[in-house]
A protein has these predicted regions:
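Short aromatic/basic micro-patch
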Residues: 7, 51-52
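Major-groove DNA-recognition helix of helix-turn-helix-type DNA-binding domains
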Residues: 15-51, 58, 65
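Helix-turn-helix DNA-binding elements, focusing on the entry/boundary residues of the two helices
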Residues: 10
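Short, amphipathic alpha-helical "recognition" segments used to contact nucleic acids or chromatin
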Residues: 1-6
Length: 66
């Protein structure tokens, strides 16, 4: 039986984009502070951990790829 997660961590998003987790964190910081950024995804926080909705990440990847 396979369980598909509804949320992605920084590491998962980085893997999908071919970037590093620190790049994802940096983009989140820039977005939060109104600076120029490329990663246009809104994180949800579970406790203090930023998580990204899987469907939104996949839509972003498709938009960037095509």
């Amino acid at each position: 039986m396979s369980v598909e997660l509804a949320f992605y961590s920084d590491k998962d998003v980085a893997r999908r984009l071919g970037m590093s987790p620190s790049w994802v964190r940096g983009q989140r910081h820039k977005r939060k502070h109104g600076q120029k950024h490329l990663l246009d995804l809104e994180p949800r926080y579970i406790g203090t951990c930023a998580r990204y909705v899987r469907a939104e990440v996949e839509a972003f990847v498709a938009k960037v790829a095509g």
